[in-house]
Every structure is written in structure tokens, then in C-alpha cells.
Amino acid sequence: EQVDKLLDAIYGLPPYVFVMLGLYAGLRREEILGLQWDSVYLDCEAPYLTVRRAWHTEHNRPVILTELKTKAAHRNVPLPDNLLECLKEAKKTSTSDYVVANRDGDPLSYTQFKRLWQYIVTRTTKERCYYRYEDGKRVKHTVKPVLGQKAAHNGNVVYSLDFEVTPHQLRHTYITNLIHASVDPK
């Protein structure tokens, strides 16, 4: 149910492909952001992707490594139908070598990734704090979004998620679903 809510909330938005890869391929954040189209095989009999690169940043600049976290991190991952369709659509409009890229087609910087993830965070009902200066003093304000309401600052944002999501939770959900389907996650 939470997966459906999350996907409905971000459908058509920049983090959609990232979230689909986390939920349905179980990739780590670093693997998703380092994934290039030359590692995604959409047109073969059994579509799959190969994990062979990882992203990290140095001084907010993206660095793509071929050395992964563990030996087992080098792997082939089959693509379920919903992820296959998502990736086919994304590839049609992509002008980048990277599956998830910035406007210039380059891998995301850390700041750009945080901005990408904000599309999700802003749709949660998580309490937020901000500061304003009133009569020369810094005053803290707290906002508690209400599920189903539109954001006051942006009518396109509806608070539709009553739970928090992290990139690692996407991978955890994938592994949990494999276990429920009696598939060995290794």
C-alpha cells in the first residue's frame, strides 16, 4: 500500500525512475546513480541490468567508480515488467549515458541528489521547521502538514505520504518482497 502511495505521489516527477530502480531492482543509491544505459538490456528475451558502477561524490562532484562495495555487488538483476516499461519510457526521452542524470546528462552531484529526493520529502506529512525574522529577531515556526492538503507555497504539491522514505528503504522493500516470494535475495 505504501509503495502504491509513493509511486502515485511521484509519477512523472524526476525521482520516479530512481524509486522504481530501488523498489524493483533493489539497487543501492550509489548503484542507481552510477547506472548507465550500456548496462541496461531492455530488448533481450529476459530483460536485465548489470550492476558494474557506483556513484559517490568528492567535494560535491560526482565520481563514478567501477569498484563496488562488495564482490557480490557485481551482479545481473532481472527486470520485472513494471520496471521494464518504466525504463523503456525513460530511455525514449533520455539524452544521457546515465539512467538518472542532471539536465546536462551528467551524473548527479550530491546537492542535485538531495534536491531530487526533496520531491518525495515535500510530499510527506513530516513536521517541518523554518525560521523568519520578525522585528529583527529570528523566530522558529513549525508546520505540520495535513494528509491530503495542498502545500501553501505550491499548489502542485499535495501532502500524500503519511510515512517517511529513505533511499535505503527502497532496497529493503525489494529484499523483503523477494523473501515473501520465497526467492533467495543472494
Residue positions per predicted region:
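Basic, Lys/Arg- and aromatic-enriched nucleic-acid-binding interface segment
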Residues: 1-35, 45, 72-73
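Generic alpha-helical hydrophobic packing signal
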Residues: 3, 20-24, 33, 40, ...
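ATP/adenylate-binding site constellation spanning eukaryotic-like Ser/Thr protein kinases
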Residues: 3, 37, 80, 84, ...
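Short, basic (Lys/Arg/His-rich) helix/loop patches that form interaction surfaces
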Residues: 4-15, 25, 77, 92-99, ...
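Basic, Lys/Arg-rich DNA-contacting stretches centered on the C-terminal catalytic core
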Residues: 9-11, 30, 43-82, 90-93, ...
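Extended hydrophobic-aromatic, low-complexity segments
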Residues: 16-19, 33, 43-44, 51, ...
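An acidic- and aromatic-residue-enriched active-site/binding cleft used to recognize and process polar
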Residues: 26, 37, 54, 170
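Short, polar N-cap/turn motifs at the start of nucleic acid-interacting alpha helices
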Residues: 39-48, 164, 183-186
